Design a protein with these regions (language model features):
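Catalytic-core regions of glycoside hydrolase
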Residues: 95-97, 110, 114-214
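Feature activates predominantly on carbohydrate-active enzymes
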Residues: 1-147
Length: 214
């Protein structure tokens, strides 16, 4: 409704530089491509990128539901998706004159769907790690760095953390497959989980990012 203009962005970037603040613009990649009944712009304009086109967001009835729909994802193996996604990433980082980019990538429930002609039967951890690596490699070519939320890299079963702040669909093994240059933002709703220590022990730079309770 009220998007920032390029002039607004340049003013923000200049203020950040003046006060030695590093700015990391963010858009949601892979997951969070919809919310409830609303499909977001990427999948509206490019419906062919949808990992689960057989699931109609208009039928969303709240959580839980028969389709397992929380948020839509794009298919990381679609041959045309990264041309579009990387153009958005480059436009954003160039506009903010920054070498940091946050890709979100949290709460990815739809990945490696059985009905996806490209992802069916693929290891979910490898799919997730592959997407993280593609984005990091793209940014690294420009001297830039990727930041992501860390929840999909935590085993929700063994930790007892559960499906929202950790992974219950086996993407957690991606932690040993992604580049160590990726900066992990370790978020949790309320409880002070000790997962930042886990990420640090795995060799990643990490920041704690509490949500409801600082």
């Amino acid at each position: 409704p009220n998007p920032l203009t390029l002039q607004d962005v340049k003013r923000i970037a200049a203020t950040c530089r003046k006060h030695n603040i590093r700015i990391a613009p963010q858009i949601n990649l892979l997951g969070h491509q919809s919310w409830a009944e609303t499909t977001y712009a990427l999948l509206r304009v490019y419906p062919e990128f949808d990992e689960t086109p057989h699931v109609d967001t208009k039928n969303y009835t709240g959580w839980p539901n028969a389709d397992g729909l929380y948020c839509k994802s794009y298919c990381p193996l679609h041959p045309d998706v990264h041309k579009i996604v990387f153009a958005l990433v480059d436009e954003l980082t160039d506009a903010f004159e920054t070498n940091l980019f946050h890709a979100g990538m949290d709460e990815v429930f739809y990945i490696g769907d059985d009905k996806c002609p490209r992802c069916n039967g693929r290891d979910k951890a490898e799919l997730y790690a592959g997407e993280v690596t593609k984005i990091q490699n793209h940014l690294a070519q420009q001297g830039k760095r990727l930041m992501i939320w860390g929840d999909r890299l935590i085993d929700g079963k063994t930790t007892g953390i559960g499906a929202w702040e950790a992974s219950m669909n086996n993407t957690y093994r991606a932690i040993d497959l992604i580049p160590k240059e990726v900066f992990i933002c370790d978020w949790h709703y309320e409880r002070p989980e000790q997962t930042a220590v886990y990420f640090a022990m795995k060799g990643f730079d990490v920041a704690t990012c509490p949500w409801r309770k600082p």
